[in-house]
UniProtKB/Swiss-Prot annotation:
NCBIfam families: PRK05422.1, smpB. Keywords: Cytoplasm, RNA-binding. Disulfide bonds: none annotated. It is found in: Cytoplasm. Pfam families: SmpB (PF01668). GO terms for cellular component: cytosol. GO terms for molecular function: RNA binding. Residues 134-151 have a biased composition (Basic and acidic residues). Required for rescue of stalled ribosomes mediated by trans-translation. Binds to transfer-messenger RNA (tmRNA), required for stable association of tmRNA with ribosomes. tmRNA and SmpB together mimic tRNA shape, replacing the anticodon stem-loop with SmpB. tmRNA is encoded by the ssrA gene; the 2 termini fold to resemble tRNA(Ala) and it encodes a 'tag peptide', a short internal open reading frame. During trans-translation Ala-aminoacylated tmRNA acts like a tRNA, entering the A-site of stalled ribosomes, displacing the stalled mRNA. This is SsrA-binding protein. Residues 134-157 are annotated as: Disordered. The keyword Cytoplasm applies.
Amino acid sequence: MAEKNERPIKVVAENRKARFNYAIEDTVEAGIALTGTEVKSVRNGKTTIAESYADSRGGEIWLINANIPEYLQANRFNHEPKRPRKLLLHRKQINKLMGAVERQGMTLIPLKLYFNEKGRAKLLLALAKGKQLHDKRETEKKRDWSKEKGRLMRAKG
């Protein structure tokens, strides 16, 4: 039997500040509807999702403010870099996410943009609640203490 040519997961863009600025409750993988030039530009790896978020419009979830720069080799057929992009989710997932956003005051933020094994662009979307300044300080103290604890254990052990 022939071997399948499976590609590893390739992370293209990551929102590193999200875990510091938000308390993440749940994550869901969503497909993202892109044009041809957008896919080529994303594969180049210049995409930023740090300032982006997801919002509901007309019963669908859209990715707002994600910057996918223009593809240099596509002259007049290029796309708009910050246009809203539709996220592909099941109806039950959309209802669950939008219910949490409306009732509990949560936010939908992207964590990662990557290509899966089949070469499809996917977005790891998080249902999160914004942290206050004192929560951020507490998280930083816990992280520093765990680092210090590791150093002490290595020094004594």
